[in-house]
C-alpha cells in the first residue's frame, strides 16, 4: 500500500491522540476513557503512542455525542457497542432471508 493510499484506508491508524481528539471535538482523556471501556483499541506506535483510524474516530464520535447529552462514558460505550451488534444481526438476518427460497 502506498503512503497516499494509507490515508484513504478507514482502518489505517493515521491520527495521533491529540489530532484524533481535535477531529472529533473531544479531549485526549475522553479517547483514553473510551479505550479503557473497550469501545476502541488504538494501535500503539513503536514509541508506545496511541494511533487512531478514521473508523475508530467515527465510533468514538458516536460515544461523544451520547456523553454530550449526559450519558456516562461507560454507558455511552455500551450503547454504541449494542447498536453495532444489532445492526450486524439485522444485516445477517436480512442476508439469510434473502437466501431462503420463496415459500420455504
Predicted regions and their residues:
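Arg/Lys-rich, alpha-helical DNA-contact motif
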Residues: 2-13, 22, 36, 41-42, ...
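Residues within the helices of the helix-turn-helix
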Residues: 17-18, 32
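N-terminal cationic amphipathic segment used for targeting or macromolecule association
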Residues: 18-19, 24
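Short coil turns linking two alpha-helices in DNA-binding domains
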Residues: 27-30
